[in-house]
């Protein structure tokens, strides 16, 4: 069915400045154990070269999820331009039971039609499992590709795709009047733009659940402060600027509250603000340091880092009262957790034997799986569908962003060319 593509991010582009030095995915290890799939280069119906490699975008998205292993283009048994041209036997002979084909057609008004078809080459050979078409302007061709990826991914896995999401992160550039920048890009590093520039450090961006705002820490006043910035117009609301430390903001899933850490009474403790009234209440107390809150789906419970037992570990607490419960037991220390949107697992920074990596813990069984193999890994953030994690790690004298699938199959880097990159935060569905 033909439909016009709705541009979800148009309001951002009105005021944001697009950058040339972008972060882009560089593959570290592949997905040989993922489900084989064929993604054919989309047929271009215009003059010259196609303005965007839509088929390449779809293949990369499916690969990045860790759940698929797209066949290399050099090994494609054929390059059909339509569903009718797919020869199922040629694909099934290679163990491939689904193929994505597509078409890109220029329109007289300067726009483009992008269409795809997902074709069964296994159980019901030749059957079109999913198809769609979109009319977009040139700058939204990548978005059209991500849209096709989302639909193919959901059809084949039953999981909502997260390829049209974005990431926020902080870049410390190499000098200049404003060396600290809060940036946002597509999840794969493309279409990057600046949200805020500062002469002083910026830290810990966090998305509102509707994707319209970012909370973050700034030191522009001479001390730490928590602010919330509206992306559409740049308006900034100061949330907290108490003596000592103000940090680690986290919006509740229902959007009504903001959790954060303050040290105004000495030790770091967790607080929750009702965003409508501005009222703040303290959640933890005592001499231990409690920080890095992340919400459970019910918007009533927090996972957080505490040194209550000596070394940092992850605990759970209800914001309405009750004693914190420790939920991490493997490794010498665990911290900076991010709970999945379904509440079934969390990712965290786990240290053991002198190594600091990103790990995944099943919250029902307590089972832990180490996902990363990079150096000094920090600040993991989950995609809204729980299939991928973005995090930062040390590389040489700087820091870079890394992507790993939550099954550990796929690992990649998103290196920046103009500074150190830290504090990644994955957006909700947009």
UniProtKB/Swiss-Prot annotation:
Q: Report the locations given in the UniProt record.
A: Periplasm
A Pfam family it matches? PD40
User: According to the lineage, what is the superkingdom?
Assistant: Bacteria
Q: Which GO terms describe its cellular component?
A: periplasmic space
Does Heme show up as a keyword for this record? no
Provide the function of this protein.
Part of the Tol-Pal system, which plays a role in outer membrane invagination during cell division and is important for maintaining outer membrane integrity. TolB occupies a key intermediary position in the Tol-Pal system because it communicates directly with both membrane-embedded components, Pal in the outer membrane and TolA in the inner membrane.
Recorded protein name is Tol-Pal system protein TolB
Taxonomic lineage:
Bacteria, Pseudomonadati, Pseudomonadota, Gammaproteobacteria, Enterobacterales
């Amino acid at each position: 069915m033909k439909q016009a593509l709705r541009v979800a991010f148009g309001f951002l582009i009105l005021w944001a400045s697009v950058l040339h030095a972008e972060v882009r995915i560089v593959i570290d290890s592949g997905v040989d154990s993922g489900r084989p799939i064929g993604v054919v280069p989309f047929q271009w119906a215009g003059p010259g070269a196609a303005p965007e490699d839509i088929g390449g975008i779809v293949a990369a998205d499916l690969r990045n999820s860790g759940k698929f292993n797209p066949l290399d283009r050099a090994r494609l048994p054929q390059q059909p331009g339509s569903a009718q041209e797919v020869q199922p036997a040629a694909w099934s002979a290679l163990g491939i039971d689904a193929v994505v084909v597509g078409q890109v057609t220029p329109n007289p008004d300067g726009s483009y039609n992008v269409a795809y078809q997902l074709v069964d080459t296994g159980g019901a050979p030749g059957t079109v499992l999913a198809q769609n078409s979109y009319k977009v302007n040139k700058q939204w061709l990548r978005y059209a590709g991500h849209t096709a990826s989302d639909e193919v991914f959901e059809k084949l896995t039953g999981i909502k795709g997260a390829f049209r999401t974005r990431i926020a992160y902080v870049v410390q550039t190499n000098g200049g009047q404003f060396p600290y920048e809060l940036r946002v890009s597509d999840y794969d590093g493309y279409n990057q733009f600046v949200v805020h520039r500062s002469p002083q450090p910026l830290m810990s961006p966090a998305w509102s659940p509707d994707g319209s705002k970012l909370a973050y820490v700034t030191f522009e006043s001479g001390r730490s402060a928590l602010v919330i910035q509206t992306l559409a117009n740049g308006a900034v609301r100061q949330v907290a600027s108490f003596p000592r430390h103000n940090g680690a903001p986290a919006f509740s899933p229902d959007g009504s509250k903001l959790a954060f850490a303050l040290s105004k009474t000495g030790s770091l403790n967790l607080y929750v603000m009702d965003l409508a009234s501005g009222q703040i209440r303290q959640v933890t107390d005592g001499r231990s340091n409690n920080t890095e809150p992340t919400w459970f789906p019910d918007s009533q419970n927090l996972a957080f880092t505490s040194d209550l037992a000596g070394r940092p570990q992850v605990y759970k607490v209800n914001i309405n009262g009750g004693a914190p419960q420790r939920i991490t037991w493997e490794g010498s220390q665990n911290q900076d957790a991010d709970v999945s949107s379904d509440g079934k697992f969390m990712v965290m920074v786990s240290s053991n034997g002198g190594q600091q990596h990103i790990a995944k813990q099943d919250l029902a069984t307590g089972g832990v799986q180490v996902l990363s193999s990079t150096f000094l890994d920090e600040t993991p953030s989950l995609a809204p569908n729980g299939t991928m994690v973005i995090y930062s790690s040390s590389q040489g004298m700087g820091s870079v962003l890394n992507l790993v699938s939550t099954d550990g199959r796929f690992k990649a880097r998103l290196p920046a060319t103009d500074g150190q990159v830290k504090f990644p935060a994955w957006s909700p569905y947009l």
